[in-house]
């Protein structure tokens, strides 16, 4: 392994997640009434129901 690859591998393995996450609730997608889509699987299941 070359020196560049060794340096990259060391820096990758020694990295720590000390900071706060960048995602913020104020950027979450909301509906016009202020609710958030928290159950997308239920919505997809309901959309795929075939009416007879």
Swiss-Prot record:
Main location: other
Keywords: Sporulation
GO cellular component, one term: endospore-forming forespore
Region annotation Disordered: where it falls in the sequence: 1-52
Domain of life according to the entry: Bacteria
Listed Pfam families: SspK
GO process annotations (BP): asexual sporulation; sporulation resulting in formation of a cellular spore
InterPro entries: SASP_SspK (IPR012611)
Parts of the chain that traverse the membrane: none
Places the protein is found: Spore core
Induction trigger: Expressed only in the forespore compartment of sporulating cells.
Family: Belongs to the SspK family.
Protein name: Small, acid-soluble spore protein K
Protein source organism: Bacillus mycoides (strain KBAB4)
Higher taxonomy: Bacteria, Bacillati, Bacillota, Bacilli, Bacillales
């Amino acid at each position: 392994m070359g020196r560049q690859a060794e340096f990259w591998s060391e820096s990758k393995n020694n990295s720590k997640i000390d900071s706060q996450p960048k995602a913020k609730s104020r950027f979450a997608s909301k509906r016009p009434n202020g609710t958030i889509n928290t159950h997308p699987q239920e919505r997809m299941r309901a959309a795929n129901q075939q009416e007879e």
